[in-house]
Amino acid sequence: MKPNFLLANLVCVLCLLTSCASPKVVERDASVHSAPIIHAQEFSQKYNMQLDFMKHHFSGMLIVRELPDNEIRILASTYFGLSLFDFSLRNEEFHVNSCIEPMKKKKILRLLETDFKNLFLNGKNIRIKKKNSTFEKRVRGSGFGKSVFYLSEFVSGYPEQIKIKHPWLRLSIQLDKLKEKQD
């Protein structure tokens, strides 16, 4: 009799736990292929850049230009002329022309490669977390490879301010588009 009583109690408890719950639909952010954040053009586009990597802080300028052979050239230098890095993007191929020593690590260069591919090429596996007319937050990856893109101040569909954060690595890049002088 005791085993039947335990079995009946177990069945009742299981029925109570499973039947009283309301159905929940957990809405997840859909991964999408997104358009490039910055459209590289034939003339040089200039951005004020602040790069923080661990205990190193660099301020300077990021210059982006699309060359005639569909190569996108990305150059970062300080205001005093020290070149921080010089990268090339052609289709899906990433090439490091030069890079300063603190950032010349395989994993850091791989992170920068995915960041710049997401900025200038069609981003893959991007989750758009928040979006409205003035702000957008995009997330790619997880763990140490997680990249969070904060886009704001949109003009003609492209952001004027971009902040890229890697929370686990203490690496952040902020880009503010420089206005072209009107004569």
Protein language model features and the residues they cover:
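Bacterial N-terminal signal peptides that target proteins for export
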Residues: M1-L10
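C-terminal motif of bacterial Sec signal peptides marking the signal peptidase cleavage site
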Residues: L16-S19
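Mature, soluble, non-transmembrane domains
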Residues: A21-V25, N48-M49, F94-V96, P102-D183
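Short, low-complexity, disordered segments immediately C-terminal to signal peptides
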Residues: V25-S34
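Post-signal-peptide N-terminal segment of Sec-exported extracytoplasmic proteins
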Residues: A40-R73
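Extracytoplasmic
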Residues: S44, D69-E71, L82, N91, ...
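Short, surface-exposed coil-to-beta transition loops
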Residues: H57-M61, L82-L84, K146, P159, ...
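Mid-chain, structured segments of secreted extracytoplasmic proteins
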Residues: R73-K106
